[in-house]
From Swiss-Prot:
Essential cell division protein that coordinates cell division and chromosome segregation. The N-terminus is involved in assembly of the cell-division machinery. The C-terminus functions as a DNA motor that moves dsDNA in an ATP-dependent manner towards the dif recombination site, which is located within the replication terminus region. Required for activation of the Xer recombinase, allowing activation of chromosome unlinking by recombination. It comes from Corynebacterium glutamicum (strain ATCC 13032 / DSM 20300 / JCM 1318 / BCRC 11384 / CCUG 27702 / LMG 3730 / NBRC 12168 / NCIMB 10025 / NRRL B-2784 / 534). The chain crosses the membrane at residues 69-89, 105-125, 137-157, 182-202, 205-225. It is a multi-pass membrane protein. Keywords: ATP-binding, Cell cycle, Cell division, Cell membrane, Chromosome partition, DNA-binding, Membrane, Nucleotide-binding, Transmembrane, Transmembrane helix. Consists of an N-terminal domain, which is sufficient for the localization to the septal ring and is required for cell division, followed by a linker domain, and a C-terminal domain, which forms the translocation motor involved in chromosome segregation. The C-terminal domain can be further subdivided into alpha, beta and gamma subdomains. The alpha and beta subdomains form the DNA pump, and the gamma subdomain is a regulatory subdomain. This is DNA translocase FtsK.
Length: 921
């Protein structure tokens, strides 16, 4: 009985699923009346069709044989006990065993053989509880047995002699029942034992009292007890149940029953996932974009029904999300039910998430045998303009982050399959053939590969395993076998073998993971899932710059999409700004017009070089402000700005504002390096060397990681690497400084080395569809229009005047020489020869050029020349040598300049006394 109660929840859901599948099969087999409206309904797989694979223990062939041996031993013991207890033909040994059993459990000896037979059958059929539930089941069974023996002892009159106890509850029943009777009396001891018995049954079956009451109420026909079934019915009826009732009423000629519309009830916690995924929130209709967001939060209703991710429980989102739940309508005419055009065109996000409900709705319409009549709805009233009280002046309060519920959840991960057992046997056979003392002690199944842990015997070298890599690959019938010697943190060798049934990792699961949601870092991006089955996310601030490489089709573009979608769902435009460089012109097109952009998406390499140069100037300006305010990081600068600790000096026209983080994503670095290699490399090196504290980060992606694209200077200054499948070992060494990427199997399989990590981490990159990207982008664009910054892509070289003729082609060398001389404050020709690796003649010419421009003094024989330019004036002199106007050079605001500006302003204006209470400052 307890086992049947334990199967209650699962059987009920299986019955509903079977009925649903039978309904879809019946609909799919009927001929369609019109091609435009009748579609074949694809049956959805049951959510627990791979239940055995997911919950199966990772058992080897040895463990299975051991279980069979235990089962046969139990059968033998049951035969001996049955012969001795039931028939009295057990002989002396059997009689002795029967006496001991009677002495221990009394009358329970009569049913003990049956229990042993049942246990043996369960072991033979592998019908055992999950590993995490074994302790709970054993505790429940133990409590039931002890309580039953104590009850038998009490009902037998609490015998004091051992002969009487043999036919009652035995020693166990006496030890439990006698103290209860002496302490409480038999009238209280029996209810206490019955309650304990009931509690043991609940522990064994794993159900709650509420579920038991619902089962009992449904079994005896009481109304109002089957809440789970009502919830399923209400979920379907609320959206499409009235369509079903309308069709049935038209077919039978009865009047349709009117049911008041009501909101979906809040679902109680279940042990099984819902039959159909809940509808995902879709963005509200986009208002006319404006530079100042004027939409109130009340215009975006919040949907409290969160999608339940199969891979991991959902955690409440840290920001509200916008959603509108629409319900199809049926006209009250003699015609067949009308469907509006708006209903026939679902939102992009809900198309993918609520596919089962859409297919069921189409099946219901097709079953009617009539074409749906399109009903024209009256135009919706114009939205009421928000009042000034509804508009919050702070931009952070008027922007609502797109919810991660817009993304499609993935399927539950598999923990074990028959393929894993075959791989263990194949690897073990290879060790046996070559006489290697090593055994497979376990494995970790990831979404793409499975890592088998190999434990070596005493005196076995690790090289014996590595030398068998080709033989292992032959045994498992794949060439992409990767050895890990040793596994980090374990005294074992890892053999990574690709899975024949790969798992798709969805970005929605990564962003909805508990660790990701609890992390409040706005620049945290979802990477994917590692080989242990854990979701991997990492902050761009900690990278702080990332180099991504991989061949065509390896998953590089999918990672770029995951990065951008992660930033859109976690960061507001005031927090993170983006510069997107897309030389291919098609990869980043969906993100055109998002409010996070500093400039429109850049597709021309020349403009990309100008944008990188603009980033260098922005970095220098930020550092000057940080120096002026005595802070070392952009976080501290923004914190002091918001708290009011940093104030503009009196008389200064400068207004300090919080700086947003800037992420520059270059989709294809090779195209830029072919057009302007020197300028691109110089800008990248300068940014990656010192832009981390200024809040500027680079993400460089390329499908050709050769030495002419990823140069030594770029590699040195970009600490984090993400390598997808490469075509050769050379490319893997260029991106990772080691091999391994050439062994990856593509389609998102990657090796990730964050800053400071010694060995790469193998992950399966997250995937996001075009529909999901569009849903997130639409919601962001609906709330705010991008505010572009002028001059980001303007070519500064075209505006500069002509370089002096005497400099010629030596401008770059002259700039390096000037920077070296000014910073070291030593004008020595021999130093230029050593530092710049040039000859004496060129070094002397550079020194003469610096003398004519007032950088150094005249020659003094063998002594070093006097340096006339101070280090504070370096930026200005470099600006002048490039042919630009000195007034355009970046300058730091000194107190002398502020005093001069204050004096000039005081001469032309009237001084007003500051009075904060009156708003005058």
């Amino acid at each position: 009985m307890t086992r049947s109660i334990g199967e209650l929840g699962r059987r009920r859901n299986e019955d509903v699923l079977d009925d649903f599948d039978d309904f879809e099969e019946e609909i799919a087999t009927k001929p369609a009346t019109r091609k435009s409206r009748s579609k074949a309904v694809e049956p959805e797989p049951e959510f627990d069709e791979d239940f055995d694979e997911q919950s199966g223990n990772r058992t080897s062939a040895y463990v299975e044989e051991h279980a069979d041996g235990i089962a046969l031993s139990l059968v033998g013991i049951a035969i001996v006990l049955g012969a001795a207890v039931w028939l009295g033909i057990g002989g002396p040994i059997g009689t002795f065993i029967a006496d001991i059993v009677h002495l221990a459990i009394g009358a329970g000896a009569w049913i003990l053989p049956v229990g042993l037979i049942g246990w043996a059958v369960a072991l033979m059929l592998r019908y055992t509880p999950e590993r995490q539930a074994q302790g709970r089941v054993m505790l429940g069974i133990g409590v039931i047995i002890v309580c039953m023996l104590a009850l038998i002892h009490l009902f037998a009159g609490n015998p004091a002699e051992w002969e009487g106890r043999k036919t009652a509850g035995g020693a166990i029943g006496a030890w439990i029942g006698t103290p209860l009777e002496l302490g409480f009396s038999v009238f209280l001891a029996v209810p206490i034992l019955l309650l304990l018995l009931f509690w043991g049954a609940l522990k064994t079956t794993g159900i709650s009292i509420r579920e038991f009451i619902e089962f009992a109420g449904g079994f005896f026909g009481f109304a109002g007890f089957n809440r789970d079934e009502d919830e399923f019915d209400e979920e379907d009826d609320d959206l499409y149940g009235h369509v079903e009732r309308e069709l049935e009423s038209r077919a039978s000629g009865r009047a349709p029953s009117r049911t008041p519309s009501r909101a979906l009830p809040k679902a109680a916690p279940r042990r099984t996932p819902p039959l159909t995924p809940p509808p995902a929130p879709v963005p509200a209709p986009a208002p006319t974009p404006a530079r100042r967001p004027a939409a109130s939060l009340d215009k975006y209703p919040v949907d409290d029904a969160k999608a339940e991710a199969p891979a991991e429980p959902q955690v409440k989102q840290r920001e509200a999300s916008t959603s509108i739940l629409k319900k199809p309508s049926v006209t009250e005419t003699d015609e067949f039910p009308a469907v509006t055009e708006e209903d026939l065109a679902p939102a992009p996000a809900s198309d993918a998430v609520a596919a089962s409900r859409e297919s069921m709705r189409q099946a219901i319409i097709a079953r009617s045998g009539k074409d749906p009549v399109v009903e024209k709805k009256p135009a919706a009233p114009a939205p009421v303009a928000p009042t000034p009280a509804d508009i919050v002046s702070d931009g952070d309060s008027t922007y609502v982050l797109p919810s991660a519920d817009l993304l499609i959840p993935g399927e539950p991960a598999k923990l074990h399959s028959e393929t894993n057992d075959r791989m263990i046997e194949a690897i073990t056979d290879v060790f046996s053939e070559f006489n290697v003392d090593a055994t497979v002690t376990g494995f970790s199944r990831g979404p793409t590969v499975t890592r088998y842990e190999i434990e070596l015997g005493p005196g076995v070298k690790v090289s014996k395993i590595t030398n068998l890599q080709s033989n292992i690959a032959y045994a498992v019938a794949t060439e992409n076998v990767r050895l890990l010697t040793p596994i980090p943190g374990k005294s074992a060798v890892g053999i990574e073998v690709p899975n024949s049934d790969r798992e798709m990792v969805r970005l929605g699961d990564v962003l909805n993971a508990r660790a990701t949601v609890e992390n409040k870092d706005s620049m945290l991006i979802g990477l994917g899932k590692d080989i242990e089955g854990d979701f991997v996310s990492y902050s761009v601030q900690k990278m702080p710059h990332l180099l991504v490489a991989g061949s065509t089709g390896s998953g590089k573009s999918a990672f770029v999409n995951s990065l951008l979608v992660s930033l859109l769902t976690r960061a507001k435009p005031e927090e993170v700004r983006l510069i997107l460089v897309d030389p291919k012109m098609v990869e980043l097109t969906p993100y055109e017009g998002i409010p996070h952009l500093i400039t429109p998406i850049i597709t021309q390499p020349k403009k990309a070089a100008a944008a990188l140069q603009w980033l260098v100037e922005e970095m220098e300006q930020r550092y000057m402000d940080m120096k002026q305010t005595r802070v070392r990081h952009i976080k501290d600068f923004n914190r002091k700005i918001k708290s009011g600790e940093i104030e503009t000096p009196p008389g200064s026209k400068r207004e300090y504002r919080a700086y947003p983080y800037i992420v520059c994503v270059v989709d294809e670095l090779a195209d830029l390096m072919m057009t302007a290699p020197k300028e691109i490399e110089e800008s990248i090196v300068r940014i990656t060397q010192k832009a981390r504290a200024a809040g500027i980060h680079l993400v460089l992606a390329t499908q050709r990681p050769s030495v002419d694209v990823v140069t030594g200077l770029i590699k040195t200054n970009v600490p984090s690497r993400l390598a997808f499948a490469t075509s050769s070992l050379t490319d893997s060494r260029v991106i990772l400084d080691q091999g391994g990427a050439e062994k990856l199997i593509g389609m998102g399989d990657a090796l990730f080395i964050p800053q400071g990590a010694g060995k790469p981490q193998r992950i399966q990159g997250a995937f996001v569809t075009d529909e999901e990207i569009q849903a997130v982008v639409d919601m962001a664009k609906a709330q705010r229009q991008p505010e572009y910054t002028d001059g980001v892509t303007e070519d500064k070289a075209s505006e500069a005047k002509k370089i002096d003729a005497d400099i010629g082609n030596d401008l770059e060398d002259l700039l390096e020489a000037v920077e070296l001389v000014v910073t070291s404050q030593m004008g020595s020709t021999s130093m230029l020869q050593r530092k710049l690796r040039i000859g004496f003649a060129k070094a002397g010419r550079l020194m003469d050029l610096m003398e004519t421009r007032g950088v150094v003094g005249p020659s003094e024989g063998s002594k070093a020349r006097e340096v006339l330019v101070k280090p504070e004036e370096l930026e200005t002199i470099l600006w002048m040598l490039k042919g630009a106007d000195p007034a355009d050079a970046p300058k730091e605001e000194t107190w002398d300049d502020e005093v001069a500006a204050e004096a000039e302003e005081a001469a032309n204006t009237t001084v007003v006394q500051a009075d904060p209470s009156k708003g005058v400052c």
